[in-house]
Amino acid sequence: MKRIIMILGIAGLLSACTSGEKKVQNEDFKYLVDEFADLKVMRYQIPEWENLTLQQKEYIYYLGEAAKCGRDILADQNFKYNLTVRKTLEAILNSYKGDKKCSDYQNFVVYAKRVFFSNGIHHHYAEDKMFPEISQEYFASLVKNSDAKQLPLAEGETVDAFLDFITPVIFDKDLYAMRRSGEEDIIQNSCVNFYKGSINKGEVEAFYDAQRKPNDAQPISYGLNSKLVKENGKLHEDVYKVDGLYGKAIEQIIYWLKKANEVAENDSQRNYTNLLIDYYTTGCLKKWDEYNIAWVQDSISTIDFVNGFIEDYNDPMGMKATWEAIVDFKDLEATKRSEIISANAQWFEDNSPVDPRFKKKECKGVSAKGIIVTTLAGDCFPAPPIGINLPNADWIRKDYGSKSVTITNLMDAYDKAANESPKSVLAEFAYSQEEIDLCKKYSSIADVLHTDLHECLGHGSGQLLPTTQPGSLKEYSSALEEARADLFGLYYCADPKMVELGILPNMECYKAQYTDFIRNGLMSQLARIELGKNITEAHMQDRALISWWCYEKGLKDNVIERKVRDGKTYFVINDYEKLRGLFGDLLAEIQRVKSEGDYEEGKRLVETYAVKIDLDLHKEVKARYDALGLKPYGGFINPDIVPVVKGGKVVDYQVNYPCDFLNQHLDYGKNYSFVEENHDAPEHLVVDMLYDFIDGTLACGNAENAVHEVVKYINAHPEERVIYITDYHPANHSSFADFGGIWPVHCVQGTRGGAIHEAFYTDVINPANRPDPERNIFRKGAKVDEEQYSGFESVGPDGRMLSECVGKDLVISGIATEYCVKNTLMEFLNAGHNIELLVPGLGYVDKKGHDETMKELEKIVTVIE
């Protein structure tokens, strides 16, 4: 979903409609209902609900249920342990028996609400990990004093063992620090759950490059609806479909889509919904394209919806899509403005400052409307876009057109909620009263126009060269695409055509949008980012790129001037016409970058202008914003649509407006949880890290370094259960040379040589991951006549063999590569396990033998370098 996000700093200036009579709503309705951390929670109304027919209401109700059934998918996509964390929080909130009035518990509630808001443990916008302002000890007491039956425990797992796993996931500041990272290898340093196994960026590119067809005029969206998995060195996709990943949730979505189809308004809706069901059933991306083609050609229906894996913003590679849904119906009043714009799409395309090679010769099927949303879900909830343009496939947009919408009731809710706050970002960051007056007079009109231009025409403008593959800009594609659409809107806001078409009242109007945009891009949006952090979110990068590029290019002519008054920084536009020219120049360049697939120039633009933040300016903005007492981010509670039953028959559907954010999410957790939580972290088998193999009778190469590397890995993955496999030989063991074997005496029971290296006791941070003979030490070779290189049948403290005690996914390290490590690995591999081999954590008897063994193993398992 090419989308535009509300900027809360100017929300008080916006209105849902720019002309005409306001739709009937409850004038006493309270919009702002909760504030915590850096967030505010609002409600939105559904005007004109009573004007819908019973059939239309029923259709919306079923579509809304389909939307809510996919809720868990997004949380799981955002991070593999999000559902485990969320269900733990839900269990505490629903069953904790202790004091709920103390400050610690209230701080816990704030954390829980933040996790619900962000659909996971990472901030929904900044993407860094959030932490509860409570101690680990207090958290443990919350868990232990809650109903264990409600906790997401694995079969046979104790509460204490579960705490060993979940505590570092929540509290460790270095573990899973960023949902989507731009540092070094963007796959390995990101926590999004689109990739599993030790996969790097190059492997992802090679996997999908091998699938793409050269000069394909109608390419599918490769990788859009799947997780890329590396198992035993081989890559494959787990596809999201009925009999695949997220199958249970998808079954529920399909159930409600079928119910909706029974009461659809027309055959067009039934047709594209059936195609969507086929796509969900098969996972076939050609079916996805067929659905989008049918969907985009329906511009007549009153009711519409989006339901699927749509946007790739969260994927570091810009390929894999998060799940989202909205349900809506047409706002007839607001649609008039949008229809004027879409009717003139060809004029805008022909007159843009873009190279003619990159312009569409014919703009097809451009439709635009204002909509009233009734249900938000997935990546649109609780923090939704205010504008949408779909579908995303460039060839479908070129050949069949696109749908663009402005969500009018959400814009109205943002506006009304901002008016309930006493202070204004505008008054703080605008340089003059003249600027304030200009924005108060025209921002509501200009911003809605910019949103329409951005969504209706901006994303749909231009074309790729025939030789350019979609997705060529990779991790920079989202920021550059949003910048391209914003620039299109900014350039045309100032065109006299807007007044000629009757959309703007005069040529002063656009100046309000220019000042708002530059002020936000250079300054006010920085209030949303933690000090010292970079800009990572695509829309924020887009605004920063445009603003700082124009500031730099306009320095010679003083187009945008940086002023300081009373110790406060301001940015003032001195020449609006020249600024429009700069917008046009940058639009032309970014269109060229996209059309030609110029990755290096796209990278340069984003990295130069859209990532780094001036620390002094950042500190100033944060201090000024904090003094206002406003929250920089906002989201919503959904209305509840409830059947009204009389005489056993549904006679109406009533809209209720709940005001408790926490309760809504707890209710959703009880009624719409269809994805199993995952806390089956890989188990780490540490083989024979014993003194005799390190500095004793059988001292091995790289052994000391291997100990250091294994400890480092364990500390970087504290949630992974560690199992220590050890030789445990009697003094007369048959493997010893004195008793007919080939080895010197080693690892004898009760000797230093048979002890695990002390670093695993002293340097491993998580106590649960240290060696403990009562818990995680498995012994082999304990019988006189048993060689037993492999740990597969090593015996644990409860008498069971290791093969009976571990899950499918294993990490293996230890000594020695050619013998005990290889034999352990091969037995588990042959038993169907997925193996990752920690290469730096290996010691060896002979370097040549190690190298030969690694050549063999690299072909059959995944290696961690």
Regions found by a protein language model. Give the residues of each.
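Long, well-structured alpha-helical subdomains associated
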Residues: 45, 490-593
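Active-site recognition of the HExxH zinc-binding catalytic motif
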Residues: 53, 266, 449-463, 485
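Post-HEXXH active-site segment of zinc metalloproteases
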Residues: 462-483
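An active-site-proximal "capping" alpha-helix that borders the catalytic cofactor pocket
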Residues: 53, 266, 478-495, 707-714
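C-terminal motif of bacterial Sec signal peptides marking the signal peptidase cleavage site
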Residues: 14-16
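Contiguous, non-catalytic segments that form substrate-binding/exosite surfaces or channel walls
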Residues: 110-229, 236-435, 443
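Active-site acidic carboxylates
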Residues: 677-779, 808, 833-836, 845-858, ...
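Extended, compositionally biased alpha-helical segments that mediate assembly or anchoring
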Residues: 579-678
